[in-house]
Amino acid sequence: MERGQDTPWTQSTEHTNIQKRGSGQQTQRLEHPNSTRLMDRYLRIMSPVGMHKQIVYWKQWLSLKIPTQGSLKTRVLKRWKLFNKPEWIN
């Protein structure tokens, strides 16, 4: 495949950033559309406060994906209480 041809994949993942030089000549630079946003997010996460928030978020996410024995017990008890309500028994 020639370098000049864009596939749908490259069109969707990259965009062309056109800049004008002092002489009026245009230069093109391929850049990921979210690269600056990704870098900003990375810098925020790597700050001490951002790092703490990220750790808390991942702990919450992991507790949903890999439940501990305590959280499983809580879930089972809640389900059991809902299932054994008096109006369901009659």
From Swiss-Prot:
Biased composition (Polar residues): 7-28
The entry's keywords: Apoptosis, Host cytoplasm, Host membrane, Host mitochondrion, Host mitochondrion inner membrane, Host nucleus, Host-virus interaction, Inhibition of host innate immune response by virus, Inhibition of host MAVS by virus, Inhibition of host RLR pathway by virus, Membrane, Modulation of host cell apoptosis by virus, Viral immunoevasion
Mitochondrial targeting sequence: annotated span: 65-87
Compartment(s): Host mitochondrion inner membrane; Host nucleus; Host cytoplasm, Host cytosol
Principal subcellular localization: host cell
GO CC, any one term: host cell nucleus
Pfam family, one: PB1-F2
BP-aspect Gene Ontology terms: symbiont-mediated perturbation of host apoptosis; symbiont-mediated suppression of host cytoplasmic pattern recognition receptor signaling pathway via inhibition of MAVS activity
Residue span of region Disordered: 1-33
Known role: Plays an important role in promoting lung pathology in both primary viral infection and secondary bacterial infection. Promotes alteration of mitochondrial morphology, dissipation of mitochondrial membrane potential, and cell death. Alternatively, inhibits the production of interferon in the infected cell at the level of host mitochondrial antiviral signaling MAVS. Its level of expression differs greatly depending on which cell type is infected, in a manner that is independent of the levels of expression of other viral proteins. Monocytic cells are more affected than epithelial cells.
Other known facts: Is not encoded in all strains, and seems to be dispensable for replication.
Family label: Belongs to the influenza viruses PB1-F2 family.
The protein's assembly and partners: Oligomer. Interacts with human SLC25A6/ANT3 and VDAC1. Interacts with host MAVS.
UniProt protein name: Protein PB1-F2
